[in-house]
Amino acid sequence: MSDSKEPRLQQLGLLEEEQLGGVGFRQTRGYKSLAGCLGHGPLVLQLLSFTLLAGLLVQVSKVPSSLSQGQSKQDAIYQNLTQLKVAVSELSEKSKQQEIYQELTRLKAAVGELPEKSKQQEIYQELTRLKAAVGELPEKSKLQEIYQELTRLKAAVGELPEKSKQQEIYQELSQLKAAVGDLPEKSKQQEIYQKLTQLKAAVDGLPDRSKQQEIYQELIQLKAAVERLCRPCPWEWTFFQGNCYFMSNSQRNWHNSITACQEVGAQLVVIKSAEEQNFLQLQSSRSNRFTWMGLSDLNHEGTWQWVDGSPLLPSFKQYWNKGEPNNIGEEDCAEFSGNGWNDDKCNLAKFWICKKSAASCSGDEERLLSPTPTTPNPPPE
């Protein structure tokens, strides 16, 4: 019986050595004794229980190693955080960050102010046109030539007589040209007109100072020659059917208008024909003015007569406006009004028309016009 137990114990011992050796245990003398004692219980159950116990011991022995690895990982993370903190601390100072932020804010505002797409298209087209215009500029040598020419012109202008003198010359030319248009002798008019045209062209060309002085003296001589020519009407008067008419540019009452005409050897207009009426009515309505004529009923209410004492002919009554004369509020003086005549108060200030006979010119007759004024003086203040 004892012989059979011994081989079995040896087998158990070998098996335990293999299993325990696989989990990292060394055989000891005590261990062998423990195996021998356990041989008295259910051998398989005891062997499994011990195997589980050995596995637990192995796992427990590995826990410190895992903890050590976790600690190493934490240390690595901490080191990385430390390095990041150092890197952040080395960033630009706060003022630099603020500057960048402000710049970004300005850029954002600028982008917000960009024009809408249609406006951008318009700007683009304008830039294209400008680019084309720049491309058409003359070459540098041409620009230099233009600049030199401008410099010469500027120097020439600096040598011109004062502006008031130029203005005086220009006004003289304008007056002479207008006067020539009223001259009776066509051949003489043509000659003087050509002279004036040439002189005007010369003045417009503005030659050197000595030439201007020569032209100015010639103008004075021409003016004197023109004034010696026979003219039917004075300056600023209008010729019509053998008479001269002056249309005033200021206003007076009816009585002062008579005086103004007498001062220049004329009278407040007296109308003698339908043609004359149409001519004067046209002059008045064209300027849209209320204008005195030499007609009133001051001597006898309702009896109209001219300033030369002649009565108003019945055929002329057709020229009164509808419902006129109505003598509302002592309206005793006649005026041109709209397309006809009207009676109004004689103390009102209105424009007026003077009339006198035109001068007679025959053959080569020349006479010096009267030096007395031919234009009525303005009314006293």
UniProtKB/Swiss-Prot annotation:
Q: PROSITE patterns under this entry?
A: C_TYPE_LECTIN_1, C_TYPE_LECTIN_2
The UniProt record's further free-text remark is:
In vitro, is a receptor for SIV and transmits virus to permissive T-cells.
- Topological relation to the membrane, as annotated: Single-pass type II membrane protein
The record's annotation in Pfam families points to: Lectin_C
Instruction: Say where the protein is mainly found.
Output: membrane
Q: What tissues is it present in?
A: Expressed in lymph nodes.
Q: Which residues form the C-type lectin domain?
A: 240-355
Q: What is this protein called?
A: CD209 antigen
Region 6 X approximate tandem repeats, annotated ranges = 96-303
Per UniProt, the keywords (alphabetical) are: Adaptive immunity, Calcium, Cell adhesion, Disulfide bond, Endocytosis, Glycoprotein, Immunity, Innate immunity, Lectin, Mannose-binding, Membrane, Metal-binding, Receptor, Repeat, Signal-anchor, Transmembrane, Transmembrane helix
Query: Which windows of the sequence hold sequence repeats?
Result: 96-118, 119-141, 142-164, 165-187, 188-210, 211-234
Q: Which residues lie on this side of the membrane: Cytoplasmic?
A: 1-37
| Cell membrane as UniProt keyword | no
Q: How does it assemble?
A: Homotetramer. Interacts with C1QBP; the interaction is indicative for a C1q:C1QBP:CD209 signaling complex. Interacts with ICAM2 and ICAM3 by binding to mannose-like carbohydrates. Interacts (via C-type lectin domain) with CEACAM1 (via Lewis X moieties); this interaction is regulated by the glycosylation pattern of CEACAM1 on cell types and regulates contact between dendritic cells and neutrophils.
Q: Where in the cell is it found?
A: Membrane
* Function recorded in the entry: Pathogen-recognition receptor expressed on the surface of immature dendritic cells (DCs) and involved in initiation of primary immune response. Thought to mediate the endocytosis of pathogens which are subsequently degraded in lysosomal compartments. The receptor returns to the cell membrane surface and the pathogen-derived antigens are presented to resting T-cells via MHC class II proteins to initiate the adaptive immune response. Probably recognizes in a calcium-dependent manner high mannose N-linked oligosaccharides in a variety of pathogen antigens.
Per the record, ranges on the Extracellular side are 59-381
Source species, domain of life: Eukaryota
Sequence motif Endocytosis signal, residues = 14-15, 16-18, 31-34
Question: Mind telling me which PANTHER family this protein's record contains?
Answer: MANNOSE, PHOSPHOLIPASE, LECTIN RECEPTOR RELATED (PTHR22803)
**Species assigned in the record:** Chlorocebus aethiops (Green monkey)
Q: Where are the transmembrane segments?
A: 38-58
The glycosylation sites annotated in the UniProt record are 80
